[in-house]
Amino acid sequence: VSAVLPAVLHAAPRLVLDADALNVIAADATLQTALRQRAAAGQATVLTPHPLEAARLLGRTSAEVQQHRLRAAVQLADLFACTVVLKGSGTVIATPGQAPLINPTGNARLATAGTGDVLAGLIGARLAAGQNAAQAASAAVYLHGRAADCWPAASTLTAGTLARRLGAALAPAAAPIGAA
């Protein structure tokens, strides 16, 4: 990740950063500067940290992030000049210059390995479709959480099944107008 991240930060017009990318950025001041410079270049960026990743980026503890989730998300958004999705119960979406949003959907079933990757992919797809970072993040977080809220009680939520169900549910909306 650390070998390719400088080039990705410089060249990608739209970017979602999660997991290892966030940990590498947290430990590298040069990458932090490159991340900040993306906004000035008009490059859309969304960070999707969980509380521990957010803590590393802010130089705090995860307990401090959890205690002040709104503040932490806004600070990250302002620090890196991008949209931040602080995952967890009451996922927070923060964008510089905008009021932070608290997502009303989702539940503990999303605390499953790989579901954050599904969310990152959903945000990336919306960015690729032309939505701005704040719109892409808030819509994706809502849909991701709504899928978990509607999940059948007798069925296990896995990342693979979540991705397939979201894909099937969203396919009609992605079809070109007039397509059958």
Label each PLM-derived region with a short phrase.
Residues 1-104, 177-180:
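Glycine-rich phosphate/dinucleotide-binding loop and adjoining beta-alpha-beta core of small-molecule
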Residues 56, 93-95, 119, 145-152:
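Short active-site-adjacent structural elements
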Residues 56, 112-143:
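Short, small-residue alpha-helix embedded
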Residues 60-69, 130-135, 152-157:
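Short, charged, surface-exposed loops that flank catalytic or proteolytic processing sites
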Residues 101-114:
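Short pre-catalytic strand/loop immediately N-terminal to key active-site residues, enriched for Gly-Thr
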Residues 146-180:
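Charged C-terminal helix
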